[in-house]
Amino acid sequence: MPLCRPEHLMPRASRVPVAASLPLSHAVIPTQLPSRPGHRPPGRPRRCPKASCLPPPVGPSSTQTAKRVTMGWPRPGRALVAVKALLVLSLLQVPAQAVVRAVLEDNSSSVDFADLPALFGVPLAPEGIRGYLMEVKPANACHPIEAPRLGNRSLGAIVLIRRYDCTFDLKVLNAQRAGFEAAIVHNVHSDDLVSMTHVYEDLRGQIAIPSVFVSEAASQDLRVILGCNKSAHALLLPDDPPCHDLGCHPVLTVSWVLGCTLALVVSAFFVLNHLWLWAQACCSHRRPVKTSTCQKAQVRTFTWHNDLCAICLDEYEEGDQLKILPCSHTYHCKCIDPWFSQAPRRSCPVCKQSVAATEDSFDSTTYSFRDEDPSLPGHRPPIWAIQVQLRSRRLELLGRASPHCHCSTTSLEAEYTTVSSAPPEAPGQ
């Protein structure tokens, strides 16, 4: 049966009346186990104690207990606010679950213990950290501690620290300054896992080693396992290796899906809008022009002498191409087409009626009538108008010169046209 250290062999700092500060179920005689093999009190048998005989760790210091008694516990309202704040912080900053593995007999067997990594310092590497577990003085590591004595061992050292009496960041910083590669902080009188946070910003910036928090039962088992096997060591591992897949991060997965969906919806909206505008543009170009704006001049073939062109003052001959405007005036196609192309507006040369469109190279455009007023400054009548006026004046003069000739203006015009078109006689005949 395992032997426990008698009370008179305990250090003075450990002689605390446990029954006075603990419930009746915890009032047991405290014992002290060797931290490493070979450091047992004289006269002890070389037997490894069981976990049932492990001493309960000493609770918080008397100073903190006195402060609690003096200041009192927080009020229920403040406690509720504190609980809500802790819940919010836990949602915003959830640490990754890690594992403390006790490796026995040259990696032949191992025991895992659950823990929580600290929210400060460097995170655990995927391959983990190996080292021999050691206890130091003071056990709470609130003051500078002793450096580890490894001798010829190939692995580093991992320190086991008791909770309370100071902040977590100070404990881990003292372990780092002593030369330990990692720190394990265990709970006291509880098996709950606590997320370790920092208090002092300047201390947090100096911490460069990882640290984890374990329960009280895990610390007791680690003492027994690692204290009874010389080749046993501790291995701090992250529970899950780092995952770069979106399936490991639900929030990122949902955000990615929502982002892709929104991008597809916006793209589809722009594409449909562009197609709709393109379809409207095509329909507008294919709409038929109104009947009132697409009146075209009629083209006919002249078959008999019945009139003359008001532009060139030549009679129509058989086979000439004539163009009849909407106002029923007829012109040569070779005369009216250049007229339309050079005139500032498309209108009949005689009656000035607007022509919406023609059949040969003209658009159905109606021009303004502001230039039709001859009284406007800068107005110059066209050549054909001057020729018409001169021709009318000549006919009038011919009619006055022959008072005994009872001929109409039409007959005089025809006679004048015949005379003017006859070839001149040669002299001397």
From Swiss-Prot:
GO terms for molecular function: ubiquitin protein ligase activity; zinc ion binding. CDD domains: PA_C_RZF_like, RING-H2_RNF13-like. Residues 1-27 form the signal peptide. It is a single-pass type I membrane protein. Residues 28-250 are lumenal. Glycans are attached at residues 107, 152, 229. One of its GO terms (biological process) is ubiquitin-dependent protein catabolic process. Its EC number is 2.3.2.27. It catalyses: S-ubiquitinyl-[E2 ubiquitin-conjugating enzyme]-L-cysteine + [acceptor protein]-L-lysine = [E2 ubiquitin-conjugating enzyme]-L-cysteine + N(6)-ubiquitinyl-[acceptor protein]-L-lysine. Residues 30-67 are annotated as: Disordered. Residues 37-49 have a biased composition (Basic residues). Residues 151-223 form the PA domain. The chain crosses the membrane at residues 251-271. A zinc finger (RING-type) spans 309-352. E3 ubiquitin-protein ligase that acts as a negative regulator of NOD2 signaling by mediating ubiquitination and degradation of RIPK2. Also catalyzes ubiquitination and proteasomal degradation of CANX within the endoplasmic reticulum. Could have a role in spermatogenesis. The RING-type zinc finger is involved in CANX ubiquitination and degradation, but is not required for interaction with CANX. Interacts with CANX. This is E3 ubiquitin-protein ligase ZNRF4. It comes from Homo sapiens.
